[in-house]
């Protein structure tokens, strides 16, 4: 009789746990649905995950090897992947380059063919990375050597033909890129 009593309470406990788990799942679903409805479009993923998603999207679109895209993001703003919760790529360099891929406004305007504001370049992650990948694609079509392309990336596209071959920081950037 004792065994049957223990078995009964054991089965009862399992049933209660299952019902509680189902209730928690339902509450979680309702909460997510409520938040999505209430905050329509204002819920965002962590900044580092947004950068990751944009790099994945545009490196595929423009056929940029992922290791190139991620190395440049690391060299420009120390981006270390989608789980780098401390990452904050909304940076402006001393030269005026903006965002996670450090794009100069003049370069952005040249690559996209329309005026991009500094604010857009800094805060619109997707646009910043799209311009970056488009620039890398254009440079690779022109030079066909990723080490050279990555060095030229650092100077900005309009300046490539004028002084990139002689730029000391360009040589330093190329050597840092190759080491990563």
Kindly give the residue locations of the regions a language model identified.
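Catalytic glycan-binding domains that act on GlcNAc-containing polysaccharides
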Residues: 27-180
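N-terminal Sec-pathway targeting helices
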Residues: 1-17, 24, 28
